[in-house]
Each structure stands twice: as structure tokens, then as C-alpha cells.
């Protein structure tokens, strides 16, 4: 268990959200962030920078939508963090990722400080089995039927999907494992942490499971919120 932290302004615990941009549309998302803003929760909104080459049903809006981009810039002015969720919802080659990062900086006047890999994009960095080392990697391969041991190539210098050097340059924090416990810090007490076996990521962080309504509500139940406060913990909902 992480030793109790003295949080700023005498706060008893931390709660924030990393919002995965999958299936987002402007109308619904604006309502959610209006509520968060009224409650003074300055959370993280991830984005896709450009439209993908291959359309995917329900993939969600990207920063190429001018109305959406203008709204994101207003969010940023209010104190919300804009995160990176890969350049787009399709796999991106090295040059495409570099162009996406450059466009992100131009759009938001800053590097994307935080990111999460998107689903099954081949340029995902240290994703799938590559998140693990030693015996844990072997166990993961067995549990997944060796289906994901070679797919992700963002860290592989020989791959056209390699962008590890750009990740090191542009990104400070990359999301790794997700836990069912509301107290993310309790599940991963060393975050943000470094893994010297994975040199292209500066720092890793974990999060708590909330990828659908049922899991989100279960994780942030009143009972769990009370425990988070009692433990003086930190929750990063994903």
C-alpha cells in the first residue's frame, strides 16, 4: 500500500478521468463536459488528430471537424487537459504518426503530455504482451493464445510503425494497465513509474476500469468512494 499522501489544499483524496475518445460525438460529449465543468472537475479529454484512411462505423469525431476542434480549444481554456489517443482510429505508419503529433502541437500549442494506446492500432507502443517481461509475458501469451505477441510494433525499430523516438520526445505519460479497484494508486503504488526495459516511454500510469456504464458505476459506487477517501487514495477512471 502506498503511504498516505498529503494532497494539495488539504484534500483527502484524488479523483479524475481519462476520457477515451472512442465513439464520441460533439453533441453528447458537450453535455458531459458541461456537467464536469459545473462540478469543477478538470479532467482529461483524449482526441484523434485526423480522420482515418478507412472509415469505421461509430469510430467517433476527430480534430478535423472544425466545430469539434473549436470546442476542444474552449475546453482547454477552461483548464481541461487534452490527451492523445494515437493519430487516428486506424493504424498509422511512422510518418503519419509524426505528422499527427506535429498537428496536435500546432492545434493545441503544446505537446500531448498524456496518451493511451487505441485498441488494435499496430503502432501501439509496448502494447499487448509487450507490456510485460519474463514469466508474466509467457503467462499472458498462454492466456491470449499467442494472438498478440507480434502485432503491436510502435517500439520496434525495424517496423514501419515505429515511433518510439517520437513518443520519448513528445509524450510524458502513457497509460498501461487497468484495475477494477477505485483506488488506482493502491493497485499501482509506484505510478508514475519508469520501466528501463521499455526506454521509449518516459513514465507509465495505470487507471481504474470504467469503459462502460455498468463498470463505471460499479467502480465509483458510494461505498467505494467512501473507501477511496478513507484510504487517501487516487483514482484515474478510464
Which functions belong to the PLM regions below?
Residues 1-205, 213-238:
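Catalytic alpha-helical scaffold of carbohydrate-active enzymes acting on polysaccharides/glycoconjugates
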Amino acid at each position: 500500500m502506498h503511504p498516505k499522501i498529503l494532497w494539495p489544499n488539504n484534500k483527502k483524496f484524488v479523483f479524475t478521468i481519462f476520457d477515451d475518445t472512442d465513439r464520441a460525438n460533439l453533441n453528447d460529449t458537450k453535455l458531459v463536459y458541461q456537467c464536469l465543468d459545473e462540478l469543477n472537475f478538470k479532467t482529461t479529454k483524449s482526441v484523434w488528430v485526423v480522420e482515418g484512411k478507412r472509415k469505421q462505423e461509430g469510430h467517433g469525431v476527430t480534430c478535423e471537424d472544425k466545430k469539434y476542434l473549436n470546442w476542444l480549444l474552449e475546453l482547454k481554456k477552461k483548464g481541461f487537459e487534452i490527451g492523445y489517443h494515437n493519430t487516428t482510429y486506424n493504424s498509422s505508419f511512422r510518418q503519419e504518426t509524426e505528422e499527427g503529433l506535429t498537428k496536435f502541437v500546432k492545434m493545441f500549442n503544446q505537446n500531448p503530455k498524456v496518451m493511451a494506446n487505441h485498441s488494435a492500432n499496430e503502432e501501439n507502443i509496448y502494447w499487448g504482451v509487450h507490456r510485460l517481461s519474463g514469466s508474466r509475458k509467457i503467462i499472458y501469451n498462454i492466456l491470449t493464445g499467442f494472438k498478440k505477441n507480434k502485432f503491436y510494433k510502435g517500439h520496434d525499430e525495424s517496423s514501419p510503425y515505429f515511433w518510439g523516438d517520437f513518443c520519448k520526445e513528445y509524450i510524458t505519460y502513457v497509460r498501461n494497465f487497468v484495475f477494477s479497484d477505485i483506488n488506482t494508486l493502491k493497485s499501482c503504488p509506484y505510478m508514475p513509474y519508469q520501466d528501463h526495459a521499455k526506454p521509449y516511454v518516459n513514465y507509465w500510469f495505470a487507471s481504474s476500469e470504467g469503459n462502460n456504464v455498468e463498470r463505471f458505476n460499479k467502480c465509483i459506487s458510494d461505498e467505494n468512494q467512501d473507501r477511496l477517501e478513507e484510504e487517501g487514495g487516487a483514482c484515474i477512471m478510464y
